[in-house]
Amino acid sequence: MDVEKTKVAFFIERKSRRGIHGAKLPREVTAVFVESGDYRMKDCYAHEGQHGVCAVDWVAEECRPATYVEYKPLMEELQNLVGYNLEVVDGEWWLTTAMGMVCKVDDYRSGKAA
């Protein structure tokens, strides 16, 4: 297990997806490693696909913060199988902060910042 804590927020898709034959798939829970990557892209982990990268915009538009019951199986997988020492942060708070950063950087780059 990691010695250092890894900050993570858990999100779940707002809508179910359809499989290749039209079957309704369960909504995927994604762990977002909030201190990784840059202001737009974050490392993430899901049962399906495991480690990857996700856009902050995707999290904001397609997901909502997961409840403990929803994210507990993924959290246990990350801790017990992968070996993370997790510190769970509030997803709604993190997303509000992250989207604020995206807007500030975009405004600065476009010359709209004061």
Task: Map each language-model feature to its residues.
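Intrinsic-disorder/low-complexity regions
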Residues: 1, 42, 105-106
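Tryptophan-anchored aromatic micro-motifs
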Residues: 4-18
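Mixed-charge, Lys/Arg-enriched low-complexity segments
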Residues: 59-114
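Acidic, low-complexity, intrinsically disordered interaction modules
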Residues: 20-72
